[in-house]
Amino acid sequence: MQAIKCVVVGDGAVGKTCLLISYTTNAFPGEYIPTVFDNYSANVMVDGKPINLGLWDTAGQEDYDRLRPLSYPQTDVFLICFSIISPSSFENVNGKWHPEICHHAPNVPIILVGTKLDMREDKETQDRLKEKKLYPISYEQGLAKMKEINAVKYLECSALTQKGLKTVFDEAIRAVINPPLSKKKKSSGGCNIL
């Protein structure tokens, strides 16, 4: 059985841990949400192939900047997460997360993930952002960012409703077991030296 290591990165509070808990338990976490989810291993079938998927959570806060890269060696695929309702987390995709991954783990495929999809149409959330002259991140903006950082895919999901959640992990596995043909020739990764 092929083993795949998937590491999840992104700003604090974008929903990385909820994403992992919701996916692995089929339930949104209750009151207590840990800073970092314990590493988790699941046997899944994707495209008829049995896969042992190892999921690694990371802490997004700056306090962990020196420790976080210790989980990067031997990673097969990264999920860079941002919250659809947090423009600053979206900016940090290429302000922080993409450069960090390229430095520590070049040539590893990246999936860009917009979290909190259920909140994009939430009136209260929209009003709170508008007060700061901000708006939720659109699907088109996510696609543009995917191309900018040379990610394999851009996906959106909600850990709360589970919409798009399984697809995120299925596509992460596919990025490893069926790398896109155009990338096979060059490299399988999402890092370009500029």
Swiss-Prot record:
It is found in: Cell membrane. It is a lipid-anchor. PROSITE patterns: RHO. Its main location: membrane. SUPFAM superfamilies: P-loop containing nucleoside triphosphate hydrolases. The modification Cysteine methyl ester is found at C191. The keyword Membrane applies. GTP binds at residues 10-17, 57-61, 115-118. Interacts with forH. Interacts with pakB. May interact with limE. Interacts (in GTP-bound form) with rgaA. Overexpression promotes the formation of filopodia and membrane ruffles. This is Rho-related protein rac1A. It comes from Dictyostelium discoideum (Social amoeba).
